[in-house]
Amino acid sequence: MSDNHTLQIEEILDLLPHRYPFLLVDRVLDFEEGKFLRAVKNVSFNEPFFQGHFPGKPIFPGVLILEAMAQATGILAFKSVGKLEPGELYYFAAIDGARFKRPVLPGDQMVLEVEFIKERRGVARFKGVAKVDGEIACEAEMMCARRREV
């Protein structure tokens, strides 16, 4: 893994519109344009949603695991096709086959692995997996669409 295939938080902030508390990718470990991306989300007990999900038994919300994978696909899309034109956005279009295999807890490091499957008429399909300690926490196929802002 070479330095030119990693991204630090400053570079991620330049690519994604998300900000705290909704930025769910801390670092990109490796990627190959048009192929795959591997990133990390460090799960801290200080995340604001742990106050209510669930009191006394904090669990990272499954929908946010999916969102973290979607953000990783966004980074891969940006690195593969370049920045969007003014007035364009990537919209999260669909999710298929989402499966949750284990809980993600405070202190876990979630590794996000996304793979480009295909693109047709501005709609891209990706396969995503979130792992903790090498064990699958969540997997799904996702689609995003490149469109003009509405």
Curated annotation (Swiss-Prot):
It is an enzyme of class 4 (lyase). Its main location: cytoplasm. It is found in: Cytoplasm. GO terms for biological process: fatty acid biosynthetic process; lipid A biosynthetic process. InterPro entries: FabA_FabZ, FabZ, HotDog_dom_sf. It comes from Proteus mirabilis (strain HI4320). It comes from the Bacteria. Its EC number is 4.2.1.59. Keywords: Cytoplasm, Lipid A biosynthesis, Lipid biosynthesis, Lipid metabolism, Lyase. This is 3-hydroxyacyl-[acyl-carrier-protein] dehydratase FabZ. It catalyses: a (3R)-hydroxyacyl-[ACP] = a (2E)-enoyl-[ACP] + H2O. GO terms for cellular component: cytoplasm; membrane. Pfam families: FabA.
